[in-house]
Structures are given as structure tokens and as C-alpha cells.
Swiss-Prot record:
Topology in membrane: Multi-pass membrane protein
Record: residues binding heme b b562: H83, H182
Protein name: Cytochrome b
More details: Heme 1 (or BL or b562) is low-potential and absorbs at about 562 nm, and heme 2 (or BH or b566) is high-potential and absorbs at about 566 nm.
Organism: Mustela nivalis (Least weasel)
Pfam family, one: Cytochrom_B_C
Lineage, opening ranks: Eukaryota, Metazoa, Chordata, Craniata, Vertebrata
Keywords from the UniProt entry: Electron transport, Heme, Iron, Membrane, Metal-binding, Mitochondrion, Mitochondrion inner membrane, Respiratory chain, Transmembrane, Transmembrane helix, Transport, Ubiquinone
Record: residues binding heme b b566: H97, H196
Subunit-level organization: The cytochrome bc1 complex contains 11 subunits: 3 respiratory subunits (MT-CYB, CYC1 and UQCRFS1), 2 core proteins (UQCRC1 and UQCRC2) and 6 low-molecular weight proteins (UQCRH/QCR6, UQCRB/QCR7, UQCRQ/QCR8, UQCR10/QCR9, UQCR11/QCR10 and a cleavage product of UQCRFS1). This cytochrome bc1 complex then forms a dimer.
Sequence intervals crossing the membrane: 33-53, 77-98, 113-133, 178-198, 226-246, 288-308, 320-340, 347-367
Family, per entry: Belongs to the cytochrome b family.
Length: 379
């Protein structure tokens, strides 16, 4: 009798995606982050669902409903902090996943890469709207500042901002719609992730060497299922250490002050995972220019495949490109640090230099260094 796993229409899909999938024999731990992102998404959807059962999206009661969850709901505090810190883990995995793609040339699978960029934007939008929901000071002022950026769009900007707000300022209508969008987006992200996986399985996974691995494949199960489970255990361990020992480590103390439109916090800043983009935004004195730089800081990933000038796919055997890659990582860490600092000397100058370097590395230096490496190898 034929195995039902391979014949039943539903189990066949699961089988071909997670069990009998031919995978390269040499993919390293850097290939774990796809499954870890899936686990993060599941954790966020489940904790978010339970939070939504007790949360009220009204300006008068939003802050106290979050307090109620933490104080009165059974294990509400752990659900709330798992959700808040789960977002941080999500972004850590996202950044490492994108970094892996850049380092090993995975961006050459252009469909998978482009869906990935759309996913990144969707997750960033979801996280931003989620940060507004507790209705603390940083929630309110963060929402005001970031939505206000759209007013830089010529002609329609002001109308667009007021349309998004549902009034003349961030208020009850804004909070209600942000909650609605924050609830629906993770399900859209799930669908996009399935498409991301569909496109990936059209080509098969890349591997550290960047060389086609058709001649050396192993089944996904048990080799990579056990490897993914190990990664998942590390992820959950890290998340629970964060939740149980220092749940507010990555948050902002200002968000424990209820939102007050009459009192502006001294330093308005987003969550840590947006600081690099926020630093790029602030480093340009012009409002529209800053907004364009902010969008392009992520959108620049879309043109990376077009700028691939090397004859090798991966950076594994390209020491000069490796140096440049780690310079980019250092630059992003610098931008993250600058984004959390006040707008004063010398932080402004450092931010501007780091922003210029970021775009220089990706758009100019990487392609040039790749050509130099080709010539060094007499190709």
C-alpha cells in the first residue's frame, strides 16, 4: 500500500516541504533562521490572540486594559512580555536571516528575495502599529512622529496623514484602526511566508559555498528537522530568559506613562529594531529627503541582485567582500546606537557619516570590490 504521507493531497504538501524535501548536505546554522522566524510568527499570533481577548482599543481604557492584563489576568504578565519580547526576537532573527542572504548570495533567487523584502516591510508595519496599542507616552508620540512623515509627500501629504489619523491628530479613531490592522497583518504575513517558501522550493536552498548542490542532497527529515528543533530550543530559551529575568530591558520606560498629548517626552525614539532606519531618517535635514532615505534604506535590498558583479555567488571565498560585509554590520550597529541618542553634536555628524557609508557600501563599494576580486583571480 502506498504511504498516505505521499499520496493524500494535504499531507503530500507537508511531505514535500518538510519531510522528503531534498536539501543541500552542507547548510550551516545560518539556514536555521527561516524556521525560527516561522516559530516567532506562531508565538506572536498565539500570544497576540490571548492579549486581544482582554485588550480594549479605546484611548480612555487602552492603557488600563494592558495594566489589567498584567495584574489581574491569569499569567497575563507572561503573555504580554512574551509578545513584546517575541517581537524583539522576531527582528533579531529577521536581521540575521537577511544578513545570511547578503553574505551567501541567496538574493540571486530573485522571487524569494523580493517576497522577503515585502515580508520585511509587512513585519515592520505590524510592529510599529503594535507599539502604539499600549497607549503610553512613546506609543502616542511615536505614532504622531512617524505618521506625520507622510505629510512630506507633495500635494496630498497633509490630506493623507489626516485620512490615516481619522481626524486632526492621533486619537481614538487612529488607535482603533491600528488595532484592526495589527490583528489582520500577521495572517497576511503568514500567507506571504507560504508564498516565500513556495518560491524557495522552486529552486531549492542555496548553500554556504554558493555552488549548485544537485549532486549532493539529503532528505530534510530527520537531518534538518532535528537541527531546527535545536535552534527552536535556543530561541525559546533566550526568549524566556528575557521574559522572566529582564522583561523591560528592550522597552522604553516612557511607555509606562499614559499618553498625554500636552506633554512631549524629551527624546522620542522607536523600539531598538527601528533605530538604524530612524538614524538615517534624522541624518538628512530635509523632511522629504529624510523620508525617502528611510524607505530606501530597506528598499535598497531590492536592487542588490542587480549589483552582483562577482563571478562567485557566495562570499565564502572572497575575503575583501567579507571585510566589507562586516564593515556594513558595524555600520548598522553604529546607526542603531546613534538612533537612540539625542539630536546634538557629535551624534548628528556620526549619524550622517554612518548613513553615507551604509549606502556607499551597498551601492558602490560591494560591486567595485567584486570586480577587483574577479580580476585578482584572473577570471
Amino acid at each position: 500500500m502506498t504511504n498516505i504521507r505521499k499520496t493524500h493531497p494535504l499531507t503530500k504538501i507537508i511531505n514535500n516541504s518538510f519531510i522528503d524535501l531534498p536539501a543541500p548536505s552542507n547548510i550551516s546554522a545560518w539556514w536555521n533562521f527561516g524556521s525560527l522566524l516561522g516559530i516567532c510568527l506562531i508565538i506572536q499570533i498565539l500570544t497576540g490572540l490571548f492579549l486581544a481577548m482582554h485588550y480594549t482599543s479605546d484611548t480612555a481604557t487602552a492603557f488600563s486594559s494592558v495594566t489589567h492584563i498584567c495584574r489581574d489576568v491569569n499569567y497575563g504578565w507572561i503573555i504580554r512580555y512574551m509578545h513584546a519580547n517575541g517581537a524583539s526576537m522576531f527582528f533579531i532573527c529577521l536581521f540575521l536571516h537577511v544578513g545570511r542572504g547578503l553574505y551567501y548570495g541567496s538574493y540571486m533567487f530573485s522571487e524569494t528575495w523580493n517576497i522577503g523584502i515585502i515580508l520585511l516591510f509587512a513585519v515592520m508595519a505590524t510592529a510599529f502599529m503594535g507599539y502604539v496599542l499600549p497607549w503610553g507616552q512613546m506609543s502616542f508620540w511615536g505614532a504622531t512622529v512617524i505618521t506625520n512623515l507622510l505629510s512630506a509627500i507633495p500635494y496630498i501629504g497633509t490630506n493623507l496623514v489626516e485620512w490615516i489619523w481619522g481626524g486632526f491628530s492621533v486619537d481614538k479613531a487612529t488607535l482603533t484602526r491600528f488595532f484592526a490592522f495589527h490583528f489582520i497583518l500577521p495572517f497576511i504575513i503568514s500567507a506571504l511566508a507560504a508564498v516565500h517558501l513556495l518560491f524557495l522550493h522552486e529552486t531549492g536552498s542555496n548553500n554556504p559555498s554558493g555552488i549548485p548542490s544537485d549532486s549532493d542532497k539529503i532528505p530534510f527529515h530527520p537531518y534538518y528537522t532535528i537541527k531546527d528543533i535545536l535552534g527552536a530550543l535556543f530561541l525559546i530559551l533566550t526568549l524566556m530568559l528575557l521574559v522572566l529575568f529582564s522583561p523591560d530591558l528592550l522597552g522604553d520606560p516612557d511607555n509606562y506613562i499614559p499618553a498625554n498629548p500636552l506633554n512631549t517626552p524629551p527624546h522620542i525614539k522607536p523600539e531598538w529594531y527601528f533605530l538604524f532606519a530612524y538614524a538615517i531618517l534624522r541624518s538628512i535635514p530635509n523632511k522629504l529627503g529624510g523620508v525617502l532615505a528611510l524607505v530606501f534604506s530597506i528598499l535598497v535590498l531590492a536592487i542588490i541582485p542587480l549589483l552582483h558583479t562577482s563571478k562567485q555567488r557566495s562570499m565564502m571565498f572572497r575575503p575583501l567582500s567579507q571585510c566589507l560585509f562586516w564593515l556594513l554590520v558595524a555600520d548598522l550597529l553604529t546607526l542603531t546606537w546613534i538612533g537612540g541618542q539625542p539630536v546634538e553634536h557629535p551624534f548628528v555628524t556620526i549619524g550622517q557619516l554612518a548613513s553615507i557609508l551604509y549606502f556607499m557600501i551597498l551601492l558602490v563599494l560591494m560591486p567595485i570590490i567584486s570586480i577587483i576580486e574577479n580580476n585578482m583571480l584572473k577570471w
